[in-house]
Amino acid sequence: MDRIVLSTLVHRDPETVFETVRDFRTYPNYAPVLDAVSADGDGGIGTRYDLDFSWWKLTYTARSEVTAIDAPERLAWRLREDVDAAGEWRIEPAPDAAPPDVETASRLFFDVAYDPHTADPNAISLPRFVSLDRVIGLVRPRLYDEAEKVVRRLVADIEGETRDVELTVHEQPGS
């Protein structure tokens, strides 16, 4: 099982941060490989999201489901099929960590665990003569880079401007 855990300080209160991470439909703004998100549900526990990805010569729809919500501290999800993966966003109040010119802050955690070797080879339309093992080898190192980009872009969206976001890496594949 591989795991990515990143955190950063967001210059907003936990409620504001939570409302942004809760809205999966905005995620294509944060991940260029994510083309579209469709929802079946009201955003609560049990809501299912189809996330349409395209990268290189591959297209894939990840079918996810919200498994837990403890607003404004936590939102958990899992993939329903094709690969063993689950994750969560955690938000902790961090007002004492706010810079002097910022009213308050929160620490945002992105935490995902996945087993790339559980991927269903029939779920992805692979180009001719390309093996699933090769695709896993190509995608695996990119997942961490994409997670960093998503968190940075999410912070810019929450705060309304781009800034140099310091990420703390708690765990990454190979660590």
For each predicted feature, which ranges?
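Beta-strand/loop substructures that line and gate deep hydrophobic ligand-binding cavities in soluble
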Residues: L79-E148, A156, V165-L167
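Short, surface-exposed coil-to-beta transition loops
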Residues: R3-V5, T59-R63, D84-E88
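Charge-rich (especially acidic), low-complexity segments
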Residues: R163-S175
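Hydrophobic ligand-binding cavity/cleft-lining segments
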Residues: M1-G44, P173-S175
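Short beta-strand micro-motifs enriched in acidic
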Residues: D40, T67-I69, R90-D96
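Short, hydrophobic/aromatic-rich segments at coil-to-beta transitions
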Residues: D42-D50, I69-W77
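Hydrophobic pocket/interface hotspot
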Residues: T16-V21, Y27, Y49-L51, V66, ...
